[in-house]
Structure formats: structure tokens, C-alpha cells
């Protein structure tokens, strides 16, 4: 009877338990079905509400922390592939159940909140790639958790008062899937719900997608573009090589590109030309050709002017020698010299003899002796070949001009006298300037007619009549005195190292001449003083004086008249009568200015060519 009563009592308890459970499950399922019928979109929301493996790990971590706090060793076993937990061991031990309930109640709500927040922070800090790698399985929510099944942890809400009275085995509570979620829901129900946790998880996933894959996509696009351009370049190169092999090296490009390249090259060339012209102009301005000349350019111009003048002078010497050698001077010259010597020598004739001796580089006493003797010195004469006059001054070799003494040759003749300089050439002279004018400027207009009878054949005057200079004791026999017919401008511009020696020689020579011929004391002060210009009145007076002398000496020979006319040109009127009056200018100053102007034009042209060459070399 007792057993039957106990059995009945247990059955009654089971019935009561079933009575309380069945209406709750029916009500929950009925409410769920109504919601699903009204709002079909809730199915998708419910799919998202299922817990993810990350959430399960977080809860497991929370449970481990709780167990470590109470120093309890337990190994909860969750089967993620099953929606219903299966108890591994069933132990009915009331004491252990009471311990579990007491351990659950010991933790306060604040401690549970702190544990959950720490778990969420750790889940946020973990990268999504690590989480994906740690997944041991692929969760298929539709298969594992069907929508129609009401066996979810949200739907099965166990009332607390029932849980207190009911006793479940310990292992069942720890290994069940519902209990941890129920505990968390009971603790965090007011602040965090599974929906909020699911939204947070989705937000974290979206943030990970926005940060990571965007940069990867950009890098992929850049790499694809690079590969595409490299492929195009390779194709273009292969086509270009094939086209060059067929055509022969020409560029395989369209006409528009060729036209553009041509225009760019033209613009570039024009810019380069303009820059070169500007540089040339700047250099010319700096050098003083367009602006104020500096000292270096002045020295260069003087040097070039002296070279040009030396070329002209050497050419004129050769011209005079060639003209004089072609004429025969026989008995008439001897008679004229005898008549001159028979007459009493006045100051003008002596001055003329000194000038002739200077022009011919013969001492005056030797010249007088030759005129008196009337014989030809055979031992001092060398035959010379016919002279060939040059056509242009530039053909004169520079080796004979660049010497300090521009009239002294490198090699000497057999008699010890310098040979004639190199062959010269003569350009077209400017208007109003002729060979006779130049000879007049140089004081050699009548040298050909004054040739003595000692040189009837074709002999060079420089080689035949160049005698040893007159000096004390013949100590300086090999030196040649300064040429008298060098222009004053040339003598001023050409600096010579041995100028003092030549001045000393000239002083000794003049002193000996004054001792030997005291009549020259009055005419020694007649010096040639060049001035920048001559007035028309002076020219007219000199022309009248020359005409009067010619009329007075009309009975004499023509050569004597020319000699006296030359002397009258050299000696101004009134200079012998009154020494205090200023010296007159010479008629040959205008000719000299013309010659210098002509040389300056050549100098300017040569300077321009020189500057252009230097500019081209610098570029």
C-alpha cells in the first residue's frame, strides 16, 4: 500500500508538472505562430538571432572564469551540431545541486556585467581573419536551426520559482545549451539582449569589410592597370621592331605624332638660335665692340693695326723696288749727280741727301763718295730674280711681319744684309687713294727716279744698297738703323724692346753728321710735327710755293724740279727765316689719314670675324 501510495504521489506530481509545462509551451508556440503569420520577415530576423560560434566561445570563457573564481574543476561539453543538449552523466545528488545554485547566486549582477563586457572587448579586438581561421566548422543556420522549430533558448523561458523547486542533475545543467544562455539572459536582460548583440556583431563585421578590402581592391586595380600598360608596351615594341625590320629603321608612328615632333624640334632650334645670338651680342658688348672698348681690346686692335700697316709697308717697298729695278738709269743720272756736286751745296740739298741716305739705309759719306766716284761696287751687289707682286695683302707670310723689327728678315744675304720680306698682295684701295699717294706719304715718290747709275739692272735696292751702318769704331756693324720712312702712327703703336738702343744710335749718328757738316745746324731744328688735320689756307700757300719753285727752276731738268718740289713739301715756308713760328703741316697728312682709315676698316672686319669665331668655339 505504501508503494502504491508513493507511486500515486509521484504520478500526481508529474501530472502537476505537465499541467504547468504544456500550457506554457502551447502559449509560446501560439504567440510565435501568430507573429510569423502577421510578419513573415521575422523568419529572417530569427535566423540572425541564432548565436554564432564567437558568442559561444565568449560564454565558455565567462564560465571558465566563474569556475576559476570558485576553484571548481568542470569540463562543460557543448555539441554545436545539436540544438538539444544531451547529458553525459546523470547524477542525482542534492548536495551538489545545492552547491551549484549557491555558486550561481554568489555572483552579483555587477560582476556578471563586468565579465560580459570584458568578453565582448576581447571579441572586438580579435581580427576577423583569425576568427575565420579558428572556426572548426561551417555553420549552416537553416539546416541546424530550422525556422519552424520552437526549441530556442528565447522561446523556452523557465520561470525562476519553478527552477528553484526543481532539482536537475549537475552535469545536465553544465552540459546543457540552454543554461548558460539563460543565466546570461537573466543577468543582462535589462541592458543587453540577443538582438543588440547580433546588431553589434553585424556592425563589427561591416567595419572590418570597410577597412580591409577597400585597400586591397585599390591595390588590385593598380596592379591590373600596370599589367595592362606593360602588355601594351610589349606589344608596341614588338610591332615597332617588326616594322623597322621591314621598312628600314623608320619610326612606326602616325603622321600626327611626326608633325608634333617636327614642330617641337623647330621651336627648340629657334630657341637655341635666339639664345646663341643673345650670347654673341653679350660677348660683343663685353669685349667693347658694341660699347666702350676695354684695354685688352685696345691692345689687340693696336697690334692688328700695326700688323696691317707692316704688311702695307712691306708691299710698298717691294713695289717700289720692282718699279725702280725695271728702269734703266745710265748716263743721265751720272751727269745729274756730277752737276749737283759741282754746284755749291746749300742746306736744302744737304737735307735732301740725308733723307735719301736714311731711305736707302746708306751713310751720307758713303753716298757722297759713290756719287763722286761714279763707279759700280761689284762686290756688294747680289743679283736677284724678277719680283712677283702679290695680288692680296693676306698672302704676305706672317713670319716676316711678326718680328720685333718688322723689316729684318730671318736669313741674311751673302754680304750680311737682310733679304727682302715675303711676297705681298694689294687689295683694291679706297676711292681717292692711289699708289702714288701712298708713296708720297712714305716719302718715296721719287726714289725710282733718284736711282744712281750704279744700279742699271734688275737689282733689289734693299740688297744692293744696304750698307753697314755708320758707328764709332764699327762696333755695331751687324745692327741696322731705324728706317726713316716708318709712319709716326706705326712708331707710336708698335712697342719695341730695343727702342732705347735705336734712339742712342740715332743720336750718335746725328752728332757725327753735325760735326762733319756744320751747315746743318740751322736745318736741324726742322722737325716734322704731325697734327690731326690741315687747313685749306696752308695747302694753298704750299701749292703756290711749289709752283713758284717750278717756274724758277724751269730751265733745269725735270728730275731736279721734282726733287726741289719734294724738299719744298717737306720744309714749310718761312721756317728758315723765322724759327719761332709754328711748323706747317705736310700735304701727305691727308693721304696718311686715308691709309689709316682703310686699315681701320680692315681691322674692324677682322675683329668681327675674330669675335664670331670665339663665340662659336665657346658654344
Swiss-Prot record:
Keyword Signal belongs to the record: yes
Stated family: Belongs to the chromogranin/secretogranin protein family.
Function as written in the Swiss-Prot or TrEMBL entry: Neuroendocrine protein of the granin family that regulates the biogenesis of secretory granules.
Keyword Zinc recorded: no
GO cellular component: dense core granule; extracellular space; neuronal dense core vesicle; secretory granule
Sites bearing Sulfotyrosine, chain numbering: 153
GO MF annotation: an example: cytokine activity
Predominant location category: secreted
Domain of life: Eukaryota
Range of residues in the leader sequence: 1-30
Gene Ontology biological process terms in this record: angiogenesis; eosinophil chemotaxis; induction of positive chemotaxis; intracellular signal transduction; MAPK cascade; negative regulation of endothelial cell apoptotic process; negative regulation of extrinsic apoptotic signaling pathway; positive chemotaxis
Keywords recorded for this protein, A-Z: Calcium, Cleavage on pair of basic residues, Phosphoprotein, Secreted, Signal, Sulfation
Residue segments, region Disordered: 247-307
Primary gene name: Scg2
Subunit structure: Interacts with Secretogranin III/SCG3.
Organism from which the protein derives: Rattus norvegicus
Biased composition (Basic and acidic residues): 255-286, 295-307
UniProt-recorded name of the protein: Secretogranin-2
Residue(s) carrying Phosphoserine: 176, 270, 434, 534, 557-558
Subcellular location: Secreted
Extra remark beyond the main annotation: Binds calcium with a low-affinity.
Amino acid at each position: 500500500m505504501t508503494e502504491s501510495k508513493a507511486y500515486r504521489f509521484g504520478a500526481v506530481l508529474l501530472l502537476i508538472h505537465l499541467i504547468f509545462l504544456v500550457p506554457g509551451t502551447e502559449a509560446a508556440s501560439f504567440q510565435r505562430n501568430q507573429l510569423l503569420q502577421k510578419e513573415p520577415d521575422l523568419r529572417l530576423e530569427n535566423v540572425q538571432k541564432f548565436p554564432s560560434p564567437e558568442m559561444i566561445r565568449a560564454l565558455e570563457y565567462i564560465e571558465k572564469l566563474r569556475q576559476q573564481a570558485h576553484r571548481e574543476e568542470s569540463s562543460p561539453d557543448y555539441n554545436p551540431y545539436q540544438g538539444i543538449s544531451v547529458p553525459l552523466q546523470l547524477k542525482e545528488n542534492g548536495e551538489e545541486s545545492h552547491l551549484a545554485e549557491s555558486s550561481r547566486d554568489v555572483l552579483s549582477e555587477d560582476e556578471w556585467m563586468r565579465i560580459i563586457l570584458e568578453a565582448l572587448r576581447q571579441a572586438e579586438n580579435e581580427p576577423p581573419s583569425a576568427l575565420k581561421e579558428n572556426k572548426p566548422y561551417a555553420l549552416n543556420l537553416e539546416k541546424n536551426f530550422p525556422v519552424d522549430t520552437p526549441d530556442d533558448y528565447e522561446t523556452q523561458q523557465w520561470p525562476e520559482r519553478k527552477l528553484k523547486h526543481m532539482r536537475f542533475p549537475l552535469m545536465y545543467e553544465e552540459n546543457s545549451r540552454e543554461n548558460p544562455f539563460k543565466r546570461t539572459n537573466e543577468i543582462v536582460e535589462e541592458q543587453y539582449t540577443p538582438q543588440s548583440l547580433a546588431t553589434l556583431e553585424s556592425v563589427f563585421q561591416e567595419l572590418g569589410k570597410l577597412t580591409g578590402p577597400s585597400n586591397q581592391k585599390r591595390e588590385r586595380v593598380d596592379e591590373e592597370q600596370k599589367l595592362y600598360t606593360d602588355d601594351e608596351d610589349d606589344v608596341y615594341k614588338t610591332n615597332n621592331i617588326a616594322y623597322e625590320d621591314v621598312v628600314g629603321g623608320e619610326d612606326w608612328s602616325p603622321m600626327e605624332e611626326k608633325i608634333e615632333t617636327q614642330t617641337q624640334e623647330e621651336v627648340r632650334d629657334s630657341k637655341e638660335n635666339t639664345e646663341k645670338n643673345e650670347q654673341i651680342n653679350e660677348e660683343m658688348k663685353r669685349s667693347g665692340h658694341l660699347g666702350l672698348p676695354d684695354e685688352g681690346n685696345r691692345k689687340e686692335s693696336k697690334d692688328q693695326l700695326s700688323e696691317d700697316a707692316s704688311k702695307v709697308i712691306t708691299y710698298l717697298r717691294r713695289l717700289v723696288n720692282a718699279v725702280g729695278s725695271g728702269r734703266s738709269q745710265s748716263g743721265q743720272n751720272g751727269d745729274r749727280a756730277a752737276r749737283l756736286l759741282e754746284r755749291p751745296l746749300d742746306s736744302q740739298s744737304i737735307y735732301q741727301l740725308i733723307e735719301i741716305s736714311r731711305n736707302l739705309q746708306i751713310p751720307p759719306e758713303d753716298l757722297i763718295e759713290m756719287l763722286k766716284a761714279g763707279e759700280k761696287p761689284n762686290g756688294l751687289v747680289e743679283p736677284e730674280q724678277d719680283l712677283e707682286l702679290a695680288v692680296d695683302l693676306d698672302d704676305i707670310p706672317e713670319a716676316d711681319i711678326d718680328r720685333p723689327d718688322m723689316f729684318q728678315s730671318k736669313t741674311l744675304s751673302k754680304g750680311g744684309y737682310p733679304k727682302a720680306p715675303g711676297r705681298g698682295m694689294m687689295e683694291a684701295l679706297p676711292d681717292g687713294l692711289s699708289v702714288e699717294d701712298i708713296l708720297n706719304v712714305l716719302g718715296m715718290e721719287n726714289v725710282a727716279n733718284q736711282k744712281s747709275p750704279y744700279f742699271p739692272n734688275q737689282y733689289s735696292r734693299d740688297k744692293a744698297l744696304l750698307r753697314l751702318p755708320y758707328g764709332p769704331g764699327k762696333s755695331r756693324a751687324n745692327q741696322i738703323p731705324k728706317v726713316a720712312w716708318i709712319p709716326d702712327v706705326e712708331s707710336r703703336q708698335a712697342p719695341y724692346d730695343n727702342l732705347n738702343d735705336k734712339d742712342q744710335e740715332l743720336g750718335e749718328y746725328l752728332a757725327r753728321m753735325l760735326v762733319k757738316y756744320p751747315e746743318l745746324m740751322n736745318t736741324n731744328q726742322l722737325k716734322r710735327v704731325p697734327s690731326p688735320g690741315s687747313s685749306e689756307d696752308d695747302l694753298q700757300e704750299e701749292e703756290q710755293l711749289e709752283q713758284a719753285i717750278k717756274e724758277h727752276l724751269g730751265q733745269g731738268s725735270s728730275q731736279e724740279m721734282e726733287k726741289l718740289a719734294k724738299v719744298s713739301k717737306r720744309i714749310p715756308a718761312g721756317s728758315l727765316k723765322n724759327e719761332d713760328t709754328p711748323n706747317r703741316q705736310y700735304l701727305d697728312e691727308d693721304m696718311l689719314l686715308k691709309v689709316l682709315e682703310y686699315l681701320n676698316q680692315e681691322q674692324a672686319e677682322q675683329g668681327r670675324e675674330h669675335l664670331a669665331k670665339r663665340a662659336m668655339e665657346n658654344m
